[in-house]
């Protein structure tokens, strides 16, 4: 059974950002030479998420508003977690909603998102 493990690191300039990693994952699938199988993409940080959806700026803004409505960053003291000296309780909650990992089929050596 063929497999490939790789780690990608991303640095963003803002507290929250949407990064389209699909091109990076496609390159890794090609590098793996796997023709049929599964691709697991896991956000290896406790406040990072991975999800599949349209890479469209309006949708990103909708996510921003929706997530901030669910778990607003401020006031910081509304969260018990932030009493530990951190200020990222909202990021932990937002990550729970957005998800930790995705699995995508590999068909004919390419990511298969369906028709």
Predicted features, each with a name:
Residues 1-115:
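Active-site histidine-anchored catalytic micro-motif
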């Amino acid at each position: 059974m063929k497999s490939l493990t790789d780690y990608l690191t991303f640095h963003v300039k803002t507290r929250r950002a949407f990064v389209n990693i699909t091109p990076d994952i496609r390159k890794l699938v090609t590098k793996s030479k796997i023709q049929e199988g599964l691709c697991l993409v896991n956000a290896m940080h406790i406040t990072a998420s991975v999800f599949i959806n349209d890479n469209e700026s309006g949708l990103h803004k909708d996510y921003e508003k929706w997530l901030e409505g669910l778990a607003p960053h401020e006031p910081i003291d509304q969260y018990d977690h932030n009493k530990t000296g951190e200020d990222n309780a909202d990021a932990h909650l937002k990550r729970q909603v957005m998800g930790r990992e995705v699995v995508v089929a590999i068909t004919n050596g390419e990511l298969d998102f369906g028709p």
